[in-house]
Structures are given as structure tokens and as C-alpha cells.
């Protein structure tokens, strides 16, 4: 997921994407615990995507305060 794509999304879309990624991370952790996870690097990528989303949401929040 590219940051430029995320910056073009609305806050509602970003929050929906964040919710989807959090549920995906939960499922990946569950699969890891049960030994069914095929690609453990996916957990790292999802965590980084969540961090990117939160960063952009915070940037948008600060833009609104300053405006």
C-alpha cells in the first residue's frame, strides 16, 4: 500500500481500511498461534500498513486544527 494512495482517501475510507487491517492482523496472529500461517512476513507488512494509516489520519487531524 502506497502512502500517495492513502493520502487521496477520505477519513472515512481510511478508518474503514484501518478496521479491515486490524481484523486481518488478528486473524494472522490466530493463524500463527495455531501453526497455519504460511507467510509470517505478512504480519509485519500489515503492522506497517496500520502505522501508515494512523500517521496519515493524524496528519489530516493536524491539518484541520491548523486551518
Swiss-Prot record:
Molecular functions per Gene Ontology: structural constituent of ribosome
Keyword annotations of the record: Ribonucleoprotein, Ribosomal protein
Entry-linked InterPro entries: Ribosomal_protein_uL29, Ribosomal_uL29, Ribosomal_uL29_CS, Ribosomal_uL29_sf
Record-linked CDD domains: Ribosomal_L29_HIP
Coiled-coil annotated residue ranges, if any: none
GO terms for cellular component: cytosolic large ribosomal subunit
GO terms of biological process kind: translation
Superkingdom of the source species: Bacteria
A Pfam entry, by short name: Ribosomal_L29
NCBIfam families: L29 (TIGR00012)
Similarity remark: Belongs to the universal ribosomal protein uL29 family.
Protein name: Large ribosomal subunit protein uL29
Species of origin: Alkaliphilus metalliredigens (strain QYMF)
Amino acid at each position: 500500500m502506497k502512502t500517495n494512495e492513502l493520502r487521496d482517501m477520505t477519513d472515512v475510507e481510511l478508518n474503514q481500511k484501518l478496521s479491515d487491517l486490524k481484523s486481518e492482523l488478528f486473524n494472522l496472529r490466530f493463524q500463527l498461534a495455531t501453526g497455519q500461517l504460511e507467510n509470517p512476513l505478512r504480519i509485519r507488512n500489515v503492522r506497517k500498513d496500520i502505522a501508515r494509516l494512523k500517521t496519515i489520519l493524524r496528519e489530516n487531524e493536524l491539518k484541520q486544527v491548523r486551518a
